[in-house]
Amino acid sequence: MQENPADAKYEISRAVKADLAAITRTYNASILERNTTATLHPVSIEEREAWFDAHEATNRQVYALREICDENLAGKDGEADCERKFDSDGKNLGAQKIGAANQKGKILAWGSLSDYHPREGYRITAEISVYAAPEARGKGLGKRLVKFILENAPKFGVKNIVALIFSSNAASLNLFAKFGFTRWGELPEVCDMSGKPESLTIPGKNLS
């Protein structure tokens, strides 16, 4: 079966610390929008490092979705998909090869699995989070990440996945519904978003 060119444009892999600057930028953009996370103030890369280390220590996964740049396309005028490098005089050196087979551009979205609850008995259940950079929305990247995470979660002993979503966030609720998530809970007005009460919907999915 021939690979869809659109599918070949992106790569999802486990994030590393070098990815945290891009991950932090995307998360902070979501914080300012006030509709996807209950974090009220922008976070620093150092704070995200502690978050990342906690995920690594508990074998919870953080994934980065980045574009893959075709070497033949990277130098074309108007091509914005590839991360470009410049010399000290500002000369465009083109997209620089990082991997052996592909050139990799910037991170456009990221997702994670986190502990649903710190007590040991809840280890079979994880919370999923997915964020896309503002300029990358509307491209189906969240869908790609959710699909990837669902396929890989059982390898790490995860049997149930839940999402914590503001009840007013119809786009996110619809995204998870497409993957068979059903409403497992509703917490009315449990969040204060700087004076605006938000209810929380909890979609869940059993992976067995």
Task: Give the positions of each predicted feature.
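Helix-loop element at the rim of GNAT/NAT acetyltransferase active sites that forms part
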Residues: R25-P42, A54-T58
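Conserved acetyl-CoA-binding loop-helix of GNAT-fold acetyltransferases
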Residues: G138-E151, N174-K178
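A short beta-loop-alpha structural element at the N-terminal edge
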Residues: E11-I23
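Conserved catalytic-core motifs of GNAT/GCN5-like acyltransferases
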Residues: S112, E120, V162-I165, T182-S199
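Conserved GNAT acetyl-CoA-binding A-motif
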Residues: A153-I165
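Acetyl-CoA-dependent GNAT
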Residues: H41-E135, V146, N206-L207
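Conserved beta-strand-loop-alpha-helix junction that forms the acyl-donor binding cleft
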Residues: R137, A163-L173
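Conserved active-site tyrosine of GNAT-family acetyltransferases
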Residues: Y27, F176, F181
